[in-house]
């Protein structure tokens, strides 16, 4: 509150903003399905749906999307059931999913603005609408198998999938000479393919009521932006920009990180300028992708009679994360990792500034005195000279290829890497203890008195421990998502 104990909305320290919007759309749909089975071991499911949407033009407002799935129980069809083999199943499917546009994407209209001198004003949108929009379409294929062995003590589930999303409705940048800065278009073809594996096991089960359930899962997904427009003129689409760009770039994985980088020589060494500071690339470069290479998890549940203890560990390997927090924290010097080089105690080098303005490193810690205003002075070449202990020598090479020997102040160094996006991109891999739960199932005598069939009390803890991570920053789920598929 701006003023204590004054309970009104206008008394908020952060003033509230509000707006009025009204959207209307009409959508109709028809759906049908057919389910067939043969001798209870072969199954076929067919579905079809047709939607009509008012947000699409009359010629394209109807879109149909079907699906077909089939499965065969091999253990039943060929009589393979035994004590060792309980269940074998193969399955496959193909489907399409359609989607319409947001309301009012077909025609450019005027919007009301603040009145001028009592006269109402209206303005035209800078977004060019499209009267020829088509519905989005996503096609998917999937295949897999399931198996269970030894009285279901070991279960396996494998799935392979591929999805293609086409005709995505995007706002693409256009030349301002057209009167608009962007235009709504059907664009974008993104392909995802991958596989998922789930393994369940009961390693221990005793007659006295002890049971150990183990579940493992693993998944890997590969995405690729196939194209953004039919003409091939658009090569990238910006999803987000703040210190770094997140792009959908043709030929690359969805969610590419794009930004400034260190200038490096042919051997990968950082190149410094004449002052000893890292050089910044003049063009943006690919710095990684925010999607992981694979994810996985391990779940264990130990139960004994009415008690059970479970814990879940999950992992994400690969992918990159950009930290605006670290970027700003380095510039302002509020992060603990910016202590490095800021004084001699934290590895800072002693130096003085020569008459020509260049910094000269002192060979060792000088015998210095401190003035009343906290400045350091030492004898250099027989003269009392102001000296500094916040020197950093960047590990790299000069433009001529020789080893860098220039000293820069820690402040200038951290200010320089503020402008280098690569310096603030981190490996997003982690392994976490995601959840621990302890449960107690109440005795049946108690639940019967409460007219309950069953009840339990559970103590749960989540996100308790980051077991492994490469970067110094806290890694969790992304805080900004702007998907186009």
Predicted regions, residues:
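Outer/extracellular conduits and scaffolds centered on Gram-negative outer-membrane beta-barrels
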Residues: 1-5, 22-31, 35-38, 43, ...
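Outer membrane beta-barrel transmembrane domains
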Residues: 9-12
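Thiolate-centered catalytic microenvironments shared by cysteine-dependent enzyme domains
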Residues: 17
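P-loop NTPase nucleotide-binding/switch module
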Residues: 116-122
